[in-house]
Amino acid sequence: MNDISETPKSCRLYVVFTSTPYRIGRLIRVVTKNPYNHVSISLDGGLDGMYSYARHYKNTPFYGGFVREYSDRYRKEFGDTKVKICALPVTEEQYRRTEERLARMTAESDRYPYNLISAFCVPFHRRFLAEGSFTCSEFALDVLSTVDERFDGRKFYTIREMEQKLDAGKVYEGDYPEPAAGCDDDFEAKQTALFYASHAARNVALRLKCRFRWRRRRGGAPAPD
């Protein structure tokens, strides 16, 4: 591991832990007894360019996937929000690969649904693996396992365990800062029940496809593109 004080700012990834101001977030914090319930990846430490798996819209808590998060998503009028930002030194090659991966996933975000089944397994410290489908902590772990040997992408980590491993790189902890820029997505757009149902059905279909591809791999046949 590189010493963070000797690492150029451009060669750091940032892991952002957040206490989200919504009911599900509060419930998760009660169950886990941890002050933070959400984790994101940032390329520059700013809160107007974070990447994670989360709800797509404010009123669709069970419809989510890969998102680029802007600071407006957690602003104060939605409730009190705390944040903790940890910096992680990486090589130029690791930074470049992570940046390219995030750009690719942003361009194809519809292919990456939220892993609801795995989310319900969290209290039991279990995971449900589905290709391209993660919870926020699973996605952060997947990224971290490619740049930090302390993280094993095959294992289960609680958000608290991730915090503890990254705590030496903490650069900020406290109230969520006021947004520096306007929200560039449709997070606050109201969605109808029909919209919600249609996308829930689509996510089920994607998961079935993931299972089909996994079974074909186990049987030795090549997975379809």
What are the roles of these predicted feature ranges?
Residues 1-225:
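Cysteine-nucleophile amide-bond enzymes
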